[in-house]
Amino acid sequence: MKKLFFILLASIFFTSCGHKEGAHNHDHHGHHHDHEHNAKLHLTGYNDIFEVYAEADPFVTGQESTILTHITWLNNFKPLSSGKVTAILNVGGKQYTYKVDLPIQAGIYRIAITPKESGTATLTYQIETRDTTSTIEIKGIDIYTNEHEAHEMAEAITPKSINVINFTKEQSWDVDFATEQAK
């Protein structure tokens, strides 16, 4: 009786887990993608004064990438409300610089950079306030020559879960919430 039960259970399991041909009509390996690429790069950097969290379009040579840069004071975990920010993308010995004098809202600076070289880059932020000048580097950013490849890579490294609860940087500024670099 136990043997019959086990065989019945195993057959139900294997038939329910089967993949039926034609049930998936999205040709992911072909070149006919009708979906939009919305994945963003999530970049984080720290120093003793600031945390920088940036949401960036994947970087592609010859195309403008928009970077929404969130800057947080580490002493109180509140947004940088004023100050000048310079972003420098260094790739292959070439530097691409973008300066912003004011945030679009407290703590958020919109930056646009168009790299002309591919390779691995470093994004350096120079943050100038009335009282201090500070630098933060974020290394290991890939610049692609192909838009499709750049977006596919960004999608591949974006965590996916059906049980996601988003907690934005803006929300963290409104409550007593702090982050800390792992040591």
Language model segments and positions:
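Intrinsically disordered, low-complexity terminal tails/loops enriched in metal-binding residues
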Residues: 1-183
